[in-house]
Amino acid sequence: MPTETEYDPSLGSKFVFVTGGVMSGLGKGITAASLGRLLSNAGFDVTAVKIDPYLNVDAGTMNPYQHGEVYVLDDGGEVDLDLGNYERFLDEDMTSDHNVTTGKVYQDVIERERSGDYLGKTVQIIPHVTDDIKRRVREAAEGSDVCLVEVGGTVGDIEGMPFLEALRQFSHEQDDEDILFTHVTLVPYSKNGEQKTKPTQHSVKELRSIGLQPDILVGRCEDRLDPDVREKIALFCDVPMDAVFSNPDVEDIYHVPLTVEEEGLDQYVMEQFDMVEDALPAAQRSTEWRDLVTRERTGEVDIALVGKYALEDAYMSIHEALKHASLEAGVEVNVLWVDSEKMHDHHERRIADADGIVVAGGFGSRGTAGKIDAIQHAREHDVPFLGLCLGFQLAVVEYARNVLGMTGAHSAEIDEDTEYPVIDLLPEQYDLEDLGGTMRLGAHETAIEPGTLAHDLYGATSCTERHRHRYEVNPEYIDDLTADGLTFSGEAGNRMEIVEHDDHPFFFGTQFHPEYRSRPTRASPPFVGLLDAVLERADVAPAGSDADVEVTN
């Protein structure tokens, strides 16, 4: 119990701390997000915090090959992609404060030391760093009933030690009934088909050595845990058997909440938190999620995703936005990966076979020629096209070159010496030296021209979407660009935000990233429009047909 001088737990939420063992990439974030979805359905206000134990202040300058996509929040925060999963599952907008990194913590502690806030004390990991971690978690949890806190990495990683120590202290400062430690661990099969518990036992042993005892164990496995395996885990890890849960592989991450519900994890958490009486009766809880993910699909379409990072996580939000649109349209979407650097290999065939084309954003010159070729194919063959950020900019470049005759037209980012810089640096970017957090970031409003495709998609004269860019359409070329069929149907002040083609069934580009605001229960309008155009244009094969389609996810 806390003393009078310690934190008052009555001011905060219930906390579920989620750690991972054995190996990274187990899906502890999806497990936590699924639990959060079910608690939200039960009528509780749920939020989430992702702890990333790296020294980067944020994810903004990290290589997508190493870390996956940089996810952008409304407030301009460039954060871990797991925050995207929390937003999609909880249908709540997060802030930069919901992503805690070692870099943020150390930066703040050092700045406070320099300003004399510590009054001459020796600044140490304990208590100064751990106190800052606890402060950040509690501030992010304000106003919620339940706060899910995911600790990135694996128990035992040296980078995560200060955070786990902070959680150990947290458990002593908080009432016992207000905190649960949930440990997600791997339960692999042996070669003879036996589920092995030893990795879990060793992982829990490591957690205990830090001073943390898990209250709940979730076994990630190919199939549900056998009863005798659950019993063995409970015995050797010192948790009740009814606190050992399975989280088996499923065909789609949006089915995980259904699995978690069947396992009873949400009910167990509510019981431990003494929240059952405050929860909505089961009959009154929303079934929207279940209805969506179990909805029958009546066809399938192939969408080519053109980008330069050969890693699915680098374009996670685009994949998910396509999935959300497919849930609304009632079709299966097969994503055909197209490496924009290999357009003239077998990838060119995928462009030709695709029912629709999405050209992703990115930075730098690598792969831009392939993206321009894909855009030209979409424009000339009336293939439904959606360009995002750089995809929007290159759609303007392609049109300038191949329709308006501006030979060599390009973005100044790619070719500083181009005769026709139809895409140029934002004016406010010229004097900046730092890369981190200096782009045009976050949610900005776009005015939409009535009577346009954009107006049809959004059903309004404005929209608010998230941005992440340094370059824009050069205002000096707008009159030339719009002289013959190209329309900028969305603007933010003097900035061009949306482009469309009057003589094309669906040629649509956005300077912003609509994928960041797409949710399973609220699909992004541009992605819905893309699939609608595909379905209008193509004969869609019945779901489960024997059509020979090459699919690369």
UniProtKB/Swiss-Prot annotation:
Positions of CTP binding: 24, 157-159, 196-201, 232
Record: active site: 389, 513, 515
PROSITE patterns assigned to the protein according to its UniProt record, in alphabetical order: GATASE_TYPE_1 (PS51273)
Sorted UniProt keywords: ATP-binding, Glutamine amidotransferase, Ligase, Magnesium, Metal-binding, Nucleotide-binding, Pyrimidine biosynthesis
Pfam families: CTP_synth_N, GATase
InterPro entries membership: Class_I_gatase-like (IPR029062), CTP_synthase (IPR004468), CTP_synthase_N (IPR017456), GATASE (IPR017926), GATase1_CTP_Synthase (IPR033828), P-loop_NTPase (IPR027417)
Name of the protein this chain belongs to: CTP synthase
Protein source organism: Halobacterium salinarum (strain ATCC 700922 / JCM 11081 / NRC-1) (Halobacterium halobium)
